[in-house]
């Protein structure tokens, strides 16, 4: 899914926080979004994901609008955003909403838990999880629907290196297997170099030059 942003503007209280004339995220590529705090990175992902619909400009998804592709887009939030339920129930939730067969739900959830090393957490409640556990569950939940576009807001911020490696591997594996378009906000230049095919640099809501990062 190619995602194209045109003449995008977002304001809060009269102040422009995002002003992007033209930006294209290539289909099947992993794109890193970097920049200082307050640069508009999360705002951009919120708009692309459909969370924030109050903006000027256009966002196209391989020539379609959001209403036609919203079931194919999912986002992992910086703090997970899990429901107050068990790990299994969290991962299964989007599949249940879609009316997926119970046997398929069971198989999908078990496979994802195994892939992310969280099988032993199946019955554990979300509020009892560590930061690294929370992010792995959040990623599993996002991947359960097999999205064509996966948006990630600092998915490995402040977690142990071993969990970071597991999450990064899962992201890359999914991209290679599904050819999904993946956008990832990160403050780590090393992570951007490890994972990303392309880099977008945001500063004060505008796209800047990212030369020299690779």
UniProtKB/Swiss-Prot annotation:
Entry's EC annotation: 7.3.2.6
Keywords: ATP-binding, Nucleotide-binding, Translocase, Transport
Reaction catalyzed: tungstate(in) + ATP + H2O = tungstate(out) + ADP + phosphate + H(+)
SMART domains, per database record: AAA
GO MF annotations, alphabetized: ABC-type tungstate transporter activity; ATP binding; ATP hydrolysis activity
Domain ABC transporter: 3-214
Binding positions for ATP per the UniProt entry: 35-42
InterPro entries: AAA+_ATPase, ABC_SmlMolc_Importer, ABC_transporter-like_ATP-bd, P-loop_NTPase
Keyword Cell membrane assigned: no
Quaternary structure note: The complex is composed of two ATP-binding proteins (TupC), two transmembrane proteins (TupB) and a solute-binding protein (TupA).
Protein purpose: Part of an ABC transporter complex involved in tungstate uptake. Probably responsible for energy coupling to the transport system.
Family classification: Belongs to the ABC transporter superfamily.
Descriptive protein name: Tungstate uptake system ATP-binding protein TupC
Source organism phylogeny: Bacteria, Bacillati, Bacillota, Clostridia, Peptostreptococcales
């Amino acid at each position: 899914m190619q995602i194209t942003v045109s003449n995008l503007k977002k304001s809060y209280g009269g102040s422009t926080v995002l002003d992007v004339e033209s930006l294209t995220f290539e289909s099947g590529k992993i794109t890193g979004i970097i920049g200082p705090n307050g640069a508009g990175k999360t705002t951009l992902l919120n708009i692309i994901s459909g969370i924030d619909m109050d903006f000027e400009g256009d966002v196209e998804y391989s020539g379609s609008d959001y209403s036609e592709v919203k079931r194919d887009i999912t986002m992992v939030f910086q703090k997970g955003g899990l429901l107050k339920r068990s790990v299994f129930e969290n991962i299964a939730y989007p599949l249940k909403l879609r009316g997926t067969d119970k046997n398929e739900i069971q198989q999908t959830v078990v496979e994802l838990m195994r892939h992310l090393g969280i099988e032993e957490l199946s019955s554990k409640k979300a509020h009892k999880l560590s930061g690294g556990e929370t992010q792995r569950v959040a990623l599993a939940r996002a991947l359960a629907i097999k999205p064509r576009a996966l948006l990630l807001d600092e998915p490995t911020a402040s977690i142990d290196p071993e969990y970071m490696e597991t999450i990064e591997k899962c992201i890359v594996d999914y991209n290679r297997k599904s050819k999904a378009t993946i956008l990832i906000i990160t403050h780590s230049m090393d992570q951007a170099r490890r994972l990303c095919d392309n880099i977008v640099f945001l500063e004060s809501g505008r796209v800047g030059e990212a030369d020299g990062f690779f």
